[in-house]
Amino acid sequence: MASLRKTHPLLSIVNNALVDLPAPSNISVWWNFGSLLGLCLITQLITGLFLAMHYTSDISMAFSSVVHICRDVNFGWLIRSIHANGASFFFICIYMHIARGLYYGSYLYKETWNVGVVLLLLVMATAFVGYVLPWGQMSFWGATVITNLLSAVPYIGNALVQWIWGGFSVDNATLTRFFAFHFLLPFVIAAATMIHLLFLHETGSNNPAGLNSDADKISFHPYFSYKDLLGFIILLMALTSLALFSPNLLGDPDNFTPANPLVTPPHIKPEWYFLFAYAILRSIPNKLGGVLALLFSILVLMLVPILHTSKQRGLTFRPLTQLLFWALVADVLVLTWIGGMPVEHPFVIIGQVASALYFLLFLVLSPAASWLENKTLEWS
């Protein structure tokens, strides 16, 4: 008689996704980040739910309610600390996951990849509206600066900004709707994740060799379930260590000051995980141009499958494109550094060069290098 997990209408879905799923035998630790992202999402949902029970989305009480959570709620300080730092770990895992996809050519599963890019945009939107909720100085001014960018939209720009604000400035209506969005979006992310997995399981996983692995598959459980468990333990240990030992390491000191519309902080900057995009935005002197560059810095990922010119899938046996990949990694790190620096010489020119290189690597240099490698190997 067949096992219940194989015959039950609901359990069979779980079984086919987590137990009897055929997986390539040679997938490395870089394939762990998908499940780590699932863990991050669950952690954020649980801690966020408990925070929402005690948070008040009113400009006169928001900052005080966060203080109340940290001082008066049982383990409130820990829940908040895990939630705030969990966001950083979420983005570390996302960027690693995307880097893996770029390196090994996983983007050739176009549906999975495009849903992934949509997921990235959703997570970024969620993180942005979440950062506004404590209603500190950087929350308020970050919301003001970033929402103001929409005024660059031709003709309807100003109306659009006032519509999002719910008034003529970032005020109570803005905070209330941002809280609503911050509560709603993670559930949309969870649904999109299911679609992401659905498309992935249509094709099966890619592997480091970039070759068809149908001839050499092993079951997900116990092999990769235990491998993922190791990743879970490492991630949770790192997260709790950061949350317990230096919870404010990645935050901005300005956010310990309640929001004041009359005092502008000396340097308005987002959390570290948005700095690369913020640097690209600032490197273009024109407002609309900057906004388009900001948007395209993420949407360029959707062009990667279209611009894939190589006869090989991954970069495992392509030294020239490997060099460009690591140049891209270095470039993003430089942009992250520049995003946190004041707008003055030499940071402006470094940011402009790094921004130009970012788009060149995606749109020109990588496809050209792939074409050259094909020619060298006489595969064209």
From Swiss-Prot:
Q: Which residues form the signal peptide?
A: none
Q: Which residues take part in binding a ubiquinone?
A: 201
Q: Look up the record and name the cofactor or cofactors this protein needs.
A: heme b
Q: Name one Pfam family in it.
A: Cytochrom_B_C
Q: Could you say which residues bind heme b b562 here?
A: 83, 182
The record ties this protein, via PROSITE patterns, to: CYTB_CTER, CYTB_NTER
Q: Where does heme b b566 bind?
A: 97, 196
Q: Please give, as recorded in its UniProt entry, the membrane topology of this protein.
A: Multi-pass membrane protein
Q: Which residues cross the membrane?
A: 33-53, 77-98, 113-133, 178-198, 226-246, 288-308, 320-340, 347-367
Would you identify the family this protein belongs to, as annotated? Answer: Belongs to the cytochrome b family.
**Further remark, if any?**
Heme 1 (or BL or b562) is low-potential and absorbs at about 562 nm, and heme 2 (or BH or b566) is high-potential and absorbs at about 566 nm.
Query: By what name is this protein known?
Result: Cytochrome b
